[in-house]
């Protein structure tokens, strides 16, 4: 049995294949996933697992250089937005780098998911609980 943080074989595999600037999406239960993009569906029921639970596990193994959020999260889900900013701050300290945070419209966000290596769908059912993570390097 694997001893590391990520036990899900699909998530572990996609993270291990990421190169510098490749992207990975963690999303809520409602984000449409392009047919051309690998979907890793973790959703069991509403809220399980939560967006933050999935993000915590993914970022424990992934070196993150940039995070992209929909601008709408600021107005429509401010509590999660603040939680995300705190998570990114802690991740910066753990990784020893600065993580750039970019905002885009939700429509542009959805278009950008088509270029991602995979979309990991959580059971989250709150608005705009989505993030695009851009891979950094560990050296």
Curated annotation (Swiss-Prot):
EC annotation from Swiss-Prot or TrEMBL: 5.4.99.62
GO terms, biological process: D-ribose catabolic process
Recorded catalytic activity of this chain's protein: beta-D-ribopyranose = beta-D-ribofuranose
Name by which UniProt lists this protein: D-ribose pyranase
HAMAP family for the chain: D_rib_pyranase (MF_01661)
Keywords for this protein: Carbohydrate metabolism, Cytoplasm, Isomerase
Purpose of the protein: Catalyzes the interconversion of beta-pyran and beta-furan forms of D-ribose.
Family: Belongs to the RbsD / FucU family. RbsD subfamily.
Gene, per the UniProt record: rbsD
Organism domain of life: Bacteria
Positions with a binding annotation for substrate: 28, 106, 128-130
Pathway the protein acts in: Carbohydrate metabolism; D-ribose degradation; D-ribose 5-phosphate from beta-D-ribopyranose: step 1/2
């Amino acid at each position: 049995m694997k001893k590391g943080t990520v036990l899900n074989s699909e998530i572990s595999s996609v993270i291990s294949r990421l190169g510098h600037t490749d992207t990975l999406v963690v999303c809520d239960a409602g984000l449409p996933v392009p047919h051309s993009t690998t979907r890793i569906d973790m959703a069991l029921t509403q809220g399980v697992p939560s967006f933050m639970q999935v993000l915590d596990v993914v970022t424990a193994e992934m070196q993150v250089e940039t995070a992209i959020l929909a601008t709408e999260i600021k107005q429509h889900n401010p509590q999660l937005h603040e939680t995300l900013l705190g998570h990114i701050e802690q991740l910066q300290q753990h990784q020893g780098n600065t993580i750039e945070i970019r905002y885009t419209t939700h429509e542009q966000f959805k278009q950008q998911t088509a270029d991602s290596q995979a979309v990991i769908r959580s059971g989250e059912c709150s608005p705009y609980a989505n993030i695009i993570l851009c891979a950094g390097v560990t050296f």
